[in-house]
């Protein structure tokens, strides 16, 4: 397998719930903010694990003599390496771990992971300065969503499936009930000819 074989999968948009927003610019009266989309370093790791789990690595080297914690990162995917500098933010979050996460994301962009986020249109939104958050988060355009989220209700389905990974009921009967409904829903997408789909365990 070569890098060119998996390029499209690396570059694919992330689910909408995986994209976070932070203010890039806030107006002088603190009423509006220009929001910037970004992803977490864990999203990058998940993407790499999904596409080429045994064929990527990431190394960091601390850059000495800088005001903020700074590292040089090297991401290698299928034998191809990309390097970039990662810098930690000001304040309590200014750690080497934060700098390494920043470096990983910057290196990943060079492989196309999350690069589409830089092409999003500028989005000014109402800003709640007391809560340090937008009154309502921006919406991603259709082209910046995965294919399965471009249909009505798709994003909600993906969120629900993701939630099940961490909140699966412990009770066996409830698990069977969840499985029954999931199997019925999936069966409606790909019906089996003959009408005999079996019963849930």
Swiss-Prot record:
Complexes and interactors: The truncated form (1-160) of DdrA forms heptameric rings that can assemble into a 3-ring structure.
Upregulation details from the record are: Induced to high levels following extreme ionizing radiation exposure. Also highly induced in response to desiccation stress.
Task: Report the protein name in the record.
Answer: Single-stranded DNA-binding protein DdrA
Q: Is-annotated flag, keyword 4Fe-4S?
A: no
Q: Which GO terms describe its molecular function?
A: DNA binding
Single GO BP term: DNA repair
Q: Which family does it belong to?
A: Belongs to the RAD52 family.
Domain remarks in the entry? Answer: The N-terminal domain (1-160) is sufficient to pilot the oligomerization process and to bind specifically single-stranded DNA, but is not functional in vivo.
Gene transcribed to yield this protein: ddrA
Q: What is the protein's known function?
A: ssDNA-binding protein that contributes to the ionizing radiation resistance of D.deserti. Plays a role in DNA repair and genome reconstitution, in a RecA-independent process, since DdrA is essential for recovery from severe genomic fragmentation as a result of exposure to severe levels of ionizing radiation in an environment lacking nutrients. In vitro, binds to the 3'-ends of single-stranded DNA, and probably protects them from nuclease degradation. Thus, DdrA is part of a DNA end-protection system that helps to preserve genome integrity following irradiation or desiccation.
Q: Which UniProt keywords apply?
A: DNA damage, DNA repair, DNA-binding, Stress response
């Amino acid at each position: 397998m070569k890098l060119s074989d998996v390029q499209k999968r690396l570059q694919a948009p992330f689910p909408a719930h995986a994209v976070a927003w932070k203010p890039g610019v806030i107006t002088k009266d603190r009423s509006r903010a220009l929001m910037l989309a970004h992803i977490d370093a864990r999203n990058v790791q998940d993407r790499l694990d999904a596409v080429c789990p045994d064929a990527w690595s990431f190394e960091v080297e601390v850059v000495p003599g800088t005001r903020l914690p700074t590292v040089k990162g090297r991401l290698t995917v299928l034998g191809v390496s990309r390097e970039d500098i990662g810098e930690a933010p000001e304040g309590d979050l200014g750690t080497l771990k934060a700098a390494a996460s920043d470096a990983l994301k910057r290196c990943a962009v060079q492989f196309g992971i999350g690069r589409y986020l830089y092409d999003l249109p500028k989005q000014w939104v109402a800003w709640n300065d007391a809560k340090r958050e937008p009154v309502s988060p921006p919406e991603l355009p259709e082209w910046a969503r995965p294919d399965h989220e471009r249909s009505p209700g798709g994003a909600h389905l993906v969120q629900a499936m993701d939630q099940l990974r961490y909140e699966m009921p412990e009770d066996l009967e409830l698990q069977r009930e969840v499985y029954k409904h999931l199997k019925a829903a999936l069966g409606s997408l790909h019906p089996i000819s003959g009408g005999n789909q079996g019963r849930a365990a």
